[in-house]
From Swiss-Prot:
Pfam families: BRCT (PF00533), DNA_ligase_A_C (PF04679), DNA_ligase_A_M (PF01068), DNA_ligase_A_N (PF04675), DNA_ligase_IV (PF11411). SMART domains: BRCT (SM00292). This is DNA ligase 4. GO terms for molecular function: ATP binding; DNA binding; DNA ligase (ATP) activity; magnesium ion binding. Residues 610-620 are annotated as: Required for catalytic activity. Keywords: ATP-binding, Cell cycle, Cell division, DNA damage, DNA recombination, DNA repair, Ligase, Magnesium, Metal-binding, Nucleotide-binding, Nucleus, Repeat. Residues 654-743, 808-911 form the BRCT domain. Mg(2+) 1 binds at E331. The gene is Lig4. The keyword rRNA-binding does not apply. NCBIfam families: dnl1 (TIGR00574). PANTHER family: DNA LIGASE 4 (PTHR45997:SF1). It is an enzyme of class 6 (ligase). Mg(2+) 2 binds at E427.
Length: 911
């Protein structure tokens, strides 16, 4: 029956190849008119076929939606995320086509952003894949639009269920049944960027005159296609409706000088600009829905009913009995009940996943109301909506609040409010006209926003050094579109910095011309960044660049940002929020960038906020504290730092050939054997000295582990040896073989050699050990303490991870602490329920690595429920008292995971 219904759709008859050839013609169209003509021809033929297929039938639900969701994939809301990026597709193609990993075509796919010089497709993965696939694929595919959508549905659902093998299987079906041209467009649909050269508004306007407006108030592509299938029939009422996500009204950036004029010389409202997640709430009785500004549904997180979620249970009783239904617009905030303050988004938390965060709670800050009961309020004035909002619910501190507003008349009041927001470390202020009506997806229209970074001179700016780059995509293909920036480790007085810590990635603030000019300036200095052998002068966090540049060849850029926030992606342990390049500091040399000390001082100055100055009326937007003048560049005599000077070996007499032509780099010596003395002795034995290790350096000698030595160790390119080894060589006048006791650090090849010669404690497999050496070996063996099972759990987990046993089914629950619903009364051990399947489940959990507890308290990660689900509500109430929230799952999650040998997606078993 289902297949019969499917065959009665236009999408089941239209080949995917026809859609792709249409998209190809649209993209290649010379002008807008030609592009529109090609799309209209395809749309008209679809509608004609639809009329022929469904003639004389009423209530037909078939529409243009199957094609529209592929043409405008960025507006897709029904399908979940694919979880696929260009790199994954590249690896899949390499595997499917059996391409040599180091071959030309495989490297093209893997390094698609790197310009090749031959073509202008750098950064366009779909085009590069097309040319690789063209000689290897079918001339024409066999899939229909319906089949493509069904396979993409499978990709999305299996990605959500973390079933990677099934994701791969569906992708293979798509790939093996498509031509190279079809795969080019398929890739763009998956990546959600078609590059057609016409906007979604143009597509909508061709489809139907009311399409843009209907999509703004519903964000539902399928509803637009169904309700507006007939271009000759319009909608009489297009307005915000209950449980349909709408695109919210937005604020325009304001010029402080023009505020009074923009408000038409009338009074206006000033509100705090909140730093949370824009969210709309739809309520009908005890049924709730929550939607983000882009129309994504977050009801599962915040709660569909008063019995579930991180918000709904706490606000349901705030609504009066006379309020059956309503639609609210506001900001979802993270509230700290201890300090009674809102958290800023820059701090590490996700408001949409607050159940996992301890010490914080979800708070809905409401600033507008669009419907109460059956009365729609979008066309009412803001003043009227505010009056209605105040009687819609009773605010509950830290759970649901009304954003406070003040009435103002002058520019001075706006300036005072902005300065007050700066003092309170807030994001900024909103200015709203009392007579404005609510216009979905419109920016401005009576709403303005003012943030400190919009006002010249209010922000502290940072002078940072470019140390890495990322190849661009699309219009920026073939050039660096983003840069990795760093600050310097504070050098000793009189020295230049030699080590730089990454701080942020920046990709905005400059025009294409400025980007091109900067690219030309740095082009010849870029080097590929290898994660296994990073440059010792650039220390990265988890964020690594695609290419890097030696600091002395780079330039300083001046960056403006909103604030400094914590981040483990960068070596500094922090990064910049909303960074953008203000200008290139041609007046500064590379070593004059800010240091870690400067960064720390800025971070402590205003809790990380970079807006610390006040604006004053009549100052022409200049702050009281004047801008720093650029530091003028003074001519300095060229000199070499003392510790990098080559030693004076003119008076050295050669006494041995033990180190003939062997290169050493001495970083430091020992008490009684300073660096210069060791260098002289090496020269006497025929060796020669360098001040920076290179590929020909035999080893680095270090008496202490300073910053330079640590950087050399982190690069993993050179062996680092104690000076004691040199002293042994000088004493015996031979090149003494290395032993573990001499080594500070070993590069990979040396480690392999030592692994064949010595055990993990440094005891040789082949050479007899004397008493002193044996004592050293014993000192390196630490006695193991008696540990409880609880203490052993992380040790076992570490061993499993070290030896790659952590993927074994026997350890699948290793990191979980689990409470089972075995007691009629929570935490009353005397109320144990006998003869229940959960007793066996507890044994299965222990056998597969879980820690099973009989007391429900902080630290429990999961609660498992059997067939008797009467206590689920009790567990949810108990959970609200805990800082770290546990998940409540059906027992079948355990049994299914054990049966299938891997953890199953938890969301399918949630109660």
């Amino acid at each position: 029956m289902a297949s019969s219904q499917t065959s009665q759709t236009v999408a089941a008859h239209v080949p995917f190849a026809d859609l792709c050839s249409t998209l190809e013609r649209i993209q290649k169209g010379k002008d807008r008119a030609e592009k529109i003509r090609h799309f209209k021809e395809f749309l008209d033929s679809w509608r004609k076929f639809h009329d022929a297929l469904h003639k004389n039938r009423k209530d037909v639900t078939d529409s243009f939606y199957p094609a529209m969701r592929l043409i405008l994939p960025q507006l897709e809301r029904e399908r979940m995320a694919y979880g696929i990026k260009e790199t994954m597709l590249a690896k899949l193609y390499i595997e499917l086509l059996n391409l040599p990993r180091e071959g030309k075509d495989a490297q093209k796919l893997l390094n698609y952003r790197t310009p090749s010089g031959a073509r202008t497709d750098a950064g366009d993965f779909a085009m590069i894949a097309y040319f690789v696939l063209k000689p290897r694929c079918l001339q024409k595919g066999s899939l229909t639009i319906q089949q493509v959508n069904e396979l993409l549905d499978l990709v999305a659902s299996n990605n959500s269920g973390k079933k990677k093998d099934l994701v791969k299987k569906s992708l293979l079906q798509l790939i093996t049944q498509s031509s190279a041209l079809e795969q080019k467009w398929l890739i763009r649909m998956i990546i959600k960027d078609l590059k057609l050269g016409i906007s979604q508004q143009t597509i909508f306007s061709i489809f139907h005159n009311d399409a843009v407006e209907l999509h703004n108030v519903t964000t539902d592509l399928e509803k637009v296609c169904r309700q507006l299938h007939d271009p000759s029939v319009g909608l009489s009422d297009i307005s915000i409706t209950l449980f349909s996500a709408f695109k919210p009204m937005l604020a325009a950036v304001a010029d402080v000088e023009r505020v009074e004029k923009d408000m038409k010389q009338q009074s206006f409202y000033i509100e705090t600009k909140l730093d949370g997640e824009r969210m709309q709430m739809h309520k009908d009785g005890a049924l709730y829905r929550y939607f983000s500004r882009n129309g994504y549904n977050y009801t599962d997180q915040f709660g569909e009913s008063p019995q579930e979620g991180s918000l709904t249970p706490f606000i349901h009783n705030a609504f009066g009995t006379d309020v059956q239904a309503c639609i609210l617009d506001g900001e979802m905030m993270a509230y700290n009940p201890t300090t009674q303050t809102f958290m800023q988004k820059g701090v590490k938390f996700d408001i949409k996943r607050m159940v996992e965060d301890s010490g914080l709670q979800t708070c809905y800050s409401v600033f507008d109301v669009l419907m109460v009961n059956k009365k729609k309020l979008g066309r009412e004035t803001l003043r009227k909506r505010y009056e209605i909002l105040s009687s819609t619910f009773t605010p509950i501190q830290g759970r649901i609040e009304i954003v406070q507003k003040t009435q103002a008349h002058t520019k001075k009041e706006v300036v005072d409010a902005l300065n007050d927001a700066i003092d309170k470390r807030e994001e900024g202020i909103m200015v709203k006209h009392p007579l404005s009506i609510y216009k979905p997806d419109k920016r401005g229209e009576g709403w303005l926003k003012i943030k400190p970074e919009y006002v010249s001179g209010l922000m502290d700016e940072l002078d940072v050094l470019i140390v890495g780059g990322y190849w661009g995509k699309g219009s920026r293909g073939g050039m660096m579109s983003h840069f990795l920036c760093a600050v310097a480790e504070t050098p000793p007085p009189g020295d230049r910095p030699s080590v730089f810590h990454t701080l942020c990635r920046v990709g905005s603030g400059y025009t294409m011309k400025e980007l091109y000019d900067l690219g030309l300036k740095l082009a010849k200095y870029w080097k590929p960044f290898h994660k296994k052998s990073p440059p010792s002068s650039i220390l990265c966090g988890t964020e690594k660049p695609e290419v890097y540049i030696e600091p002395q060849n780079s330039v300083i850029v001046q960056i403006k940002a909103a604030e400094i926030v914590p981040s483990d992606m960068y070596k500094t342990g922090s990064t910049l929020r909303f960074p953008r390049i203000e200008k290139i500091r041609d007046d500064k040399e590379w070593h004059e960038c800010m240091t870690l000390g400067d960064l720390e001082q800025l971070r402590g100055k205003a809790s990380g906020k970079l807006a610390t100055k006040h604006l004053h009326v009549g100052d022409d937007d200049e702050p009281r504290e004047k801008r720093r003048k650029p530091i003028s560049k003074t001519k300095k005599a060229i000199r070499i730092i003392e510790h990098l000077k080559a030693p004076n070996l003119s008076n050295v007499n050669k006494v041995s050939n033990v180190f003939e032509d062997v290169e050493f780099c001495v970083m430091s010596g020992l008490d009684g054997y300073p660096k210069a003395d060791l260098e002289n002795r090496i020269a006497e034995f025929g060796g020669y000295i360098v001040q920076n290790p290179g590929p020909d350096t035999y080893c680095v000698i270090a008496g202490s582990e300073n910053v330079r030595v640590k950087n050399i160790i982190s690069s993993d390119k050179n062996d680092v040896v104690k000076p004691e080894w040199l002293l042994e060589c000088f004493k015996t006048k031979t090149c003494v073989p290395w032993q573990p006791r001499f080594m500070i650090h070993m590069c990979p090849s040396t480690k392999q050699h030592f692994a064949r010669e010595y055990d993990c404690y440094g005891d040789s497999y082949f050479v007899d050990t004397d008493l002193d050496q044996l004592k050293e070996v014993f000192l390196g063996i630490k006695p193991s303490e008696q540990q409880t099972p609880e203490e052993m759990a992380p040790v076992i987990a570490d061993l499993e991870c070290r030896y790659s046993w952590d993927h074994s089914p026997l350890s699948m629950f290793r990191h979980y602490t689990i409470y089972l619903d075995l007691y009629a009364v929570i935490n009353d051990l005397s109320s144990r329920i006998e003869a229940t399947r959960l007793g066996i489940t507890a044994l299965e959990l222990r056998f597969h690595g879980a820690k099973v507890v009989s007391c429900l308290s902080e630290g429990v990660s999961h609660v498992i429920i059997g067939e008797d689900q009467r206590r689920v509500t009790d567990f949810k109430i108990f959970r609200r008292m805990l800082k770290k929230k546990f998940k409540i799952l059906q027992e079948s999650w355990v049994s299914d995971s054990v049966d299938k040998g891997e953890l199953q997606e938890e969301n399918q078993y949630l109660l």
